[in-house]
């Protein structure tokens, strides 16, 4: 457990390094208005913080910089709420009038990158505005079948699935008829909701093996929506001193171009804010970066992920509060827009 003095010194060191990207020593810190301690006292505390793993030396300076452990402690214990200026910017943005889902998401990506000077990525469902036009099910064998979904946008999707043990062909036929009757014209994002209510009631009434059929339906329709990526500030990373290295730049842009890998990186994000610092990231290309993610919703549907990529000396105070605010505002805006209240 850190002492109050160590906490203050650690916070000042991290704040300074985030702003300057330069190591700092005890003499410079002793001149800070936030540290009423002598250079000798600060030097001793910095040595203890280094022994504890919160600070580390560089090869080119006698000063210290935060370690990943230091950043992690900073994120977990020293972050405050969003300031009024940032909250005002978000409200101004969300007060705008939007006519398309893509407009909302792309604007969010651009605003987030502009406010932070980092690279923003938003994972969104591809078929948010599409409705179901038709569904067909073709049995391939006693154990497998393929469903063909056609949407109002002309998108055709084939999904193979395993048939429940012993399901009758008559039940499968009834199921397809019920789905086409009740789901035609329903937005893709609302399929799970309608299936859980209207469709479930009809299945219970008319089908012999309700449980097996409903389990099949739940596994089939209530999975993740197809995804699309929206970027903001792809070149912002070039403004960071850490990216003077050509190999780092090449590696980063190679990752950005691999949208499937980015989608896989973001799509399993849990609800709320998550901060991954440096080596906490599993993808090699971002092990020198920090990744902050937040989820957004429409109603009860988890629709996607908002993400920011930046250096490990990221402005965590600002970014985390912004991510929380923009996640909430985006959820509210999309909810109002989707329900036709705005």
Swiss-Prot record:
State the Gene3D superfamilies in the record.
3.30.450.40, Heat-inducible transcription repressor hrca homolog, domain 3 (3.30.390.60), Winged helix-like DNA-binding domain superfamily/Winged helix DNA-binding domain (1.10.10.10)
Q: Which GO terms describe its biological process?
A: negative regulation of DNA-templated transcription
Q: Under the GO molecular function aspect, what terms does this record hold?
A: DNA binding
Write out the coiled-coil annotation as residue ranges. Answer: none
Function, as annotated: Negative regulator of class I heat shock genes (grpE-dnaK-dnaJ and groELS operons). Prevents heat-shock induction of these operons.
Q: Which family does it belong to?
A: Belongs to the HrcA family.
User: What PANTHER family does the record point to?
Assistant: HEAT-INDUCIBLE TRANSCRIPTION REPRESSOR HRCA
Q: What is this protein called?
A: Heat-inducible transcription repressor HrcA
In the UniProt record, the gene name given for this protein reads hrcA
